[in-house]
Amino acid sequence: SKNISNLSGRIGLKKNLFEKISERSLNSKDASGIKEIANEYHMGVSTIHGAESFYEFLRPAHRAKKAFVCNGSACMCSGTQEPLKKKLKEKLGDDKVGEMFCLGHCYENKAFHYDGENYAGNDIDKIDEIIKGDKIEQEKFFSKSFASTSFLMDDKLSNLDQFKDILSKFINTDKQEIIKSLLDSNLTGRGGAGFPAGMKWDFCGKAKSEKKYVICNADEGDSGAFSDRYLLEDQPLKVLFGMIICGYVIGSDEGVLYIRGEYPKSIEAINGAINSLKEEGLLGENILGTSFSFDLNICIGQGAYICGEETALIASIEGRRAEVDVRPPFPVTEGLYKKPTVVNNVETLAAATGILINGADKFSAIGNKKSAGTKLVCFDSFFNNPGVYEVEMGTPMKKVLNDIG
């Protein structure tokens, strides 16, 4: 795998190997395309085919379907999916309806995917309009903060003018001062492992390498979770700001968001935000007249749940089979293309932004030293108040479930 990483890294993130494999598989039935990719990267055809065959969305059986019913736990438990599947089969044919795992519409159920878009709730009643290609009005998830200070749902970074002012401040701030803020805040990774975010950035910053990377793990695959969807679609500037500042701190000039293919609106929102930042000179070469340059790319996942694990995600971007690597070495010393890499999930990056804007002391004052700050929680349609909410760490589950949910 090290050879594949190095060969893939020679071309890098722009039109990366995984993207090329995906495009060939989704847009062409001609097997000669695999040979062309293999030749370009000096790899064997079997290596490229092995990577391609790993992903559900790239398999011929999947590509032959027209619609996909969500089989995430919230939708399955709701009892809505069998009648939904029956109706889709009546419209499209028995062999044209497949399944996808959690489309992030747990708050309304009856979720399905058709022609690159997700639908849920009462959308199935407009299936004829959807098939014709008409745009329909869709339900939006409800969101609210119950925190004394909101770090994830406030509007302090909701437009490009705010973004420019805050970015100008922090890319002219001492890097160690930013790391100290994160360490003082007691922010731990929101992806599950709970590793101190400031420590991860510090380790990567101290690693010796001419090239480093920032990765946003947006492959939110846990059924019932749609908090990343909220941040990517409603707070994209918070997430991107976190990536840019991380790049500044560790000495990286390039980052990538790995967003699951089941979230088309998230991909659209992030693409739009990146393009807007580039147009304003807030991404790219010599940002705001400084010596700091940073660019962002998007990788679209192709239906592999394991890619939520950081080493499998790195393998995927490199064009390898998305299998978990043994650690150590950890990504901060040997990550993407064997270069030092920070991998943070969506909520961690957004929280880092909130800390820099609001202050580390306010964040650390919430919860305790092991679990400080605020956290997003999701309620599915079985709750009286389905949606995504920001709560303070240390809030009793009884209050979260009974009073908020």
Give the residues covered by each predicted segment.
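Feature of Fe-S/electron-transfer and energy-metabolism proteins
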Residues: 1-405
